[in-house]
Design a protein with these regions (language model features):
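Domain-length cofactor-binding catalytic modules of enzymes
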Residues: 1-252
Length: 252
């Protein structure tokens, strides 16, 4: 059983909060708040409370200008430590989510877990301080899963721990069509035909962007992972489920 699920938008929200904090850092806002508190304390002790607002307005003029684009602002100091702490919670939450899904399915289907493992992409390896975007960890001897598409399934492999590849491997097949392009260019009848032999109730307009035709071929994947992963086998799906919206609209 292969389950693909993340933090259910929590990680995105945390990232947006800290990107705003990074922007404020580069505007000097943290420094301004610190100086502001010092001014308030100092003027109150001197009995000059009536002058505080005027002084703060003058102080504020020295902050707020960015010398780099907002999307390139980065975190440092306590803000970085706070972010790493919170994002680790998001990653643990995502892992717990997958475990719970598996547990519920196994209970309903009267199945017993023999073994399990997690392969994570688009995350921060907190222990090694490696950011993996579009990549998974593939240290030597580690069992990994590389998903391809709804039809071809996933590659089960063992990591080689290749230092030249940052102890990583590709996280999946990779797209040849963006989600927008897939929905504009692909035909649902061809999509349905390509899934023949695999039981699924998820072939619909809402999942057209996940059609096998939107991804690179299996052969392309084997060529690029050979330096990072030893392939054990390809796990072919017999059943595939994706959230797919309204049945009435999607099966016209």
């Amino acid at each position: 059983m292969v389950i693909h699920s993340g933090s259910r938008n929590l990680g995105k929200q945390v990232a947006e909060i800290y990107q705003r904090r990074a922007i404020n850092l580069h505007r000097g806002w943290d420094e301004y708040i610190l100086r502001r508190n010092e001014v308030i304390k100092e003027y109150k002790e001197l009995g000059k409370s009536q002058e505080i607002n005027q002084v703060l307005e003058k102080l504020k003029e020295g902050y707020g200008t960015l010398d780099i684009p907002e999307d390139l602002c980065w975190l440092y100091g306590d803000a970085l430590s706070d972010y790493l702490y919170d994002i680790e919670i998001c990653q643990k939450y995502a892992m717990r989510n997958r475990k719970l899904i598996a547990s519920m399915i196994m209970e309903k289907a009267s199945l017993t877990e023999i073994d399990s493992f997690h392969t994570i992409h688009n995350y921060i390896d907190i222990n090694e301080m490696i950011l993996r975007k579009g990549a998974i960890r593939a240290v030597k001897g580690e069992k990994v899963l590389i998903p391809m598409n709804m039809k071809d399934g996933s590659i089960l492999g063992i990591g080689k721990g290749n230092r030249e590849w940052n102890y990583s491997a590709p996280h999946g097949a990779g797209r040849i069509l963006s989600r927008k392009q897939a929905k504009e260019m692909l035909d649902i009848k061809e999509y349905r035909k390509s899934m023949e032999g695999i039981y699924t109730t998820s072939i619909s307009l809402d999942t057209l962007d996940e059609a096998p035709q939107a991804y690179k071929s299996v052969e392309d994947i084997f060529d690029v992972i050979k330096e990072t992963v030893d392939v054990i086998e390809v796990l072919k799906p017999v059943y595939n489920y994706k959230e797919h919206g309204d049945e009435t609209r999607n099966n016209k």
